[in-house]
Amino acid sequence: MSTAANEPSRSRGKAPAGERVADWADGRLGIYSLAKANMRKIFPDHWSFMLGEVCLYSFIIIILTGVYLTLFFHPSMAEVEYHGSYVPLQGQMMSEAYASTLDISFDVRGGLLIRQIHHWAALIFLAGMFVHMMRVFFTGAFRKPREVNWLFGFLLLVLGMFTGFTGYSLPDDLLSGTGIRFMEGAILSVPIVGTYISFFLFGGEFPGHDFVSRFYSIHILLLPGIMLGLLVGHLILVFYHKHTQFAGPGKTNKNVVGMPLLPVYTAKAGGFFFLVFGVISVVSAIATINPIWAIGPYRPDQVSTGAQPDWYMGFSEGLIRVMPGWEINAWGHTLVLGVFVPLLIFPLVLAAIAVYPFIESWVTGDKREHHILDRPRNAPTRTAFGVAWLTVYFVLLIGGGNDLWATHFHLSINAITWFVRIAFFVGPVVAFIATKRICLGLQRRDKDKVLHGRESGIIKRLPHGEFIEVHEPLSQEQLHTLTAHEQYQPAEIGPTVDENGVERKVSGTQKLRAKLSESYYGEESQIPKPTVEEYKEITSGHGHH
Ligand code: HEM
Ligand code: HEM
């Protein structure tokens, strides 16, 4: 609200310049009320809440460096003869895109560093999103009311992957061209429409003369534009929902305990931005990434050895590499299952992320809002699902780099391929079972700690000769944190025969839901929390050390 016009301070002379600018802006944008409502917004403190910030800052760094690259990059596949300062490629024929990337690397001031920062920031951005997503998943921060924000995040992840892929393809070097060839193969395996899509995308026969300029618009405009919109929406929703917090004394589902946005959080966040920028710059200055001059220009009849996509695309590469080369030939057509099946599984691996919050809320039937985070051990089935998914992902990542594993560790490539084929099915099951057991073990340990205190490491000898370890009682805060979680009862189908003896039909989905609910909250899936009576009984000193 602007009150400058009728303020008595006028009589004391002109207000300071800053205040006048603020008044001017307030009259047009209403910033006072906006700031009043949001400046004291509270953010809880936990190291894992910095992961979203890492994504944000690396995205900003990508945009800043990307703009610089656009000043010198020529998105054209026209053939030129190279006459830049990199001697080994002098006189070679190559696309303008490749030649301009060489120029960025050798002839543009600061060009190589900016290219390196752009590429490293992209890798860290995707890694940041991946780990941030894991933080959100394992703590249950995707539950109501944050499911939509989870979907926004999911879209950011998928779009980030494709933005990275299109960027990787721009320099038109032998490695990026091989990646595009891989994509063309996958598109061609789609029955009926595959050839049409490929011709449409490449403007004719692969590789054609168009894909760099097309990918360029997609890379610098379309995808980052959509991502920017989603990102703003994502952050507005984080603001609107307020941040979740871990259980602790004084923290409830209705409050947020932490630091105010201004000045504390803003100062911390500003500092953290420079830290992220600094680390990415140092890494980029030390570790070469994508030395396109050593890889050479793209020629469709050549493939470089050890060809690898960037890490976030590795799992899709793994799917293709380990799939048996099955084919069906019928009516003069070939269905290449060896490529088409991986192409179908690829979106399924990703879709599992998108749908999980909705599946969990359906199974648990929980319609309440959740602002207090779970400790992963207290949600064993969810944690086990997460680890099973990660297992599939990392097993496929091994498959994607099977040649590198083979050469670096002197292993047989066939043995690795078979390992991945078997582990793709067995790995997640073993991971699920093991994770659940570990979670339950940790729950038991928590219970033990609450009832008997912390093992102090001090061994005492009693007068009659027995050795015991002295247990120290936990503080009230620790007790609160270890016992704050809710424990649900599994949803039951209820009696199938009513009081009049009429049988009720139970549908398959109801049965499935009850079974899954049992897996989430049944006796096998949670260790009952210690009750107040149990605690009192034990701590009152009857029969315990
Ligand atoms: C461009 C990428 C992304 C950026 C810049 C970003 C940024 C952020 C920031 C700054 C926060 C608050 C701090 C924190 O909890 O870390 C946050 C929270 C959140 N993010 Fe992201 N995020 C991104 C991607 C994702 C992805 C991939 C997912 C999941 C699939 C996701 C889901 C969420 C959810 C559900 C919250 C609310 C968490 C809570 O209140 O505890 N985000 N995000
Ligand atoms: C999430 C967003 C983005 C990701 C993940 C990403 C990733 C990449 C990657 C991995 C490369 C290959 C770099 C190399 O040569 O080794 C690249 C190239 C490039 N990117 Fe991006 N980028 C993103 C956004 C942008 C934006 C917003 C712009 C421009 C405003 C941009 C402009 C460029 C240009 C001009 C190139 C080609 C030059 C070169 O390869 O050095 N990028 N990008």
Curated annotation (Swiss-Prot):
Positions contributing to heme 2 binding: H132, H234
Matches recorded under SUPFAM superfamilies: Transmembrane di-heme cytochromes
GO cellular component: membrane; plasma membrane
Parts of the chain that traverse the membrane: 54-74, 122-142, 150-170, 182-202, 220-240, 269-289, 335-355, 385-405, 413-433
Gene: qcrB
Catalytically driven reaction(s): a quinol + 2 Fe(III)-[cytochrome c](out) = a quinone + 2 Fe(II)-[cytochrome c](out) + 2 H(+)(out)
Entry-linked InterPro entries: Cyt_b/b6_N, Cytb/b6-like_sf, Di-haem_cyt_TM
Subunit structure: The cytochrome bc1 complex is composed of a cytochrome b (QcrB), the Rieske iron-sulfur protein (QcrA) and a diheme cytochrome c (QcrC) subunit.
Cofactor note: Binds 2 heme groups non-covalently per subunit.
Family membership noted in the UniProt record: Belongs to the cytochrome b family.
Membrane topology, record value: Multi-pass membrane protein
Annotated protein name in UniProt: Cytochrome bc1 complex cytochrome b subunit
Chief location of this protein within or outside the cell: membrane
Positions contributing to heme 1 binding: H118, H219
Protein task: Cytochrome b subunit of the cytochrome bc1 complex, an essential component of the respiratory electron transport chain required for ATP synthesis. The bc1 complex catalyzes the oxidation of ubiquinol and the reduction of cytochrome c in the respiratory chain. The bc1 complex operates through a Q-cycle mechanism that couples electron transfer to generation of the proton gradient that drives ATP synthesis. The cytochrome b subunit contains two ubiquinol reactive sites: the oxidation (QP) site and the reduction (QN) site.
Cofactor list: heme
Single GO MF descriptor: metal ion binding
Protein keywords: Cell membrane, Electron transport, Heme, Iron, Membrane, Metal-binding, Respiratory chain, Translocase, Transmembrane, Transmembrane helix, Transport
Entry EC no(s): 7.1.1.8
Compartments where located: Cell membrane
GO biological process, one term: respiratory electron transport chain
